[in-house]
From Swiss-Prot:
<dbReference type="Pfam" id="PF00830">
    <property type="entry name" value="Ribosomal_L28"/>
</dbReference>
<keyword id="KW-0689">Ribosomal protein</keyword>
<dbReference type="GO" id="GO:0005840">
    <property type="term" value="C:ribosome"/>
</dbReference>
<dbReference type="GO" id="GO:0003735">
    <property type="term" value="F:structural constituent of ribosome"/>
</dbReference>
<dbReference type="InterPro" id="IPR001383">
    <property type="entry name" value="Ribosomal_bL28_bact-type"/>
</dbReference>
<dbReference type="InterPro" id="IPR050096">
    <property type="entry name" value="Bacterial_rp_bL28"/>
</dbReference>
<dbReference type="InterPro" id="IPR034704">
    <property type="entry name" value="Ribosomal_bL28/bL31-like_sf"/>
</dbReference>
<dbReference type="InterPro" id="IPR037147">
    <property type="entry name" value="Ribosomal_bL28_sf"/>
</dbReference>
<dbReference type="GO" id="GO:1990904">
    <property type="term" value="C:ribonucleoprotein complex"/>
</dbReference>
<keyword id="KW-0687">Ribonucleoprotein</keyword>
<protein>
    <recommendedName>
        <fullName>Large ribosomal subunit protein bL28</fullName>
    </recommendedName>
</protein>
<dbReference type="InterPro" id="IPR026569">
    <property type="entry name" value="Ribosomal_bL28"/>
</dbReference>
<dbReference type="GO" id="GO:0006412">
    <property type="term" value="P:translation"/>
</dbReference>
<comment type="similarity">
    <text>Belongs to the bacterial ribosomal protein bL28 family.</text>
</comment>
Length: 66
């Protein structure tokens, strides 16, 4: 399974509950994007980041797209 290079976010598992509270297994997948970035000014590298992490990093300046 792929995971976010910064936050470590990966697929989560749990149950989908119906009105009668029957349990069916399901998963929640993070919105992973393969991007080439510079993290904190280091060399450019290709990593997987969630869209949420990418947006936050671009806004606060810790991530720079290449």
């Amino acid at each position: 399974m792929a995971k976010d290079a910064i936050t470590g976010a990966r697929t989560r598992f749990g149950n989908q509950r119906s009105h009668a509270l029957n349990a069916n297994r399901r998963s929640w997948k993070p919105n992973l994007q393969k991007v080439t970035v510079k993290i904190n000014g280091d060399a450019a590298k290709t990593v997987y980041l969630t869209a949420r992490t990418l947006r936050a990093g671009l806004k606060n300046g810790s991530i720079e797209r290449v």
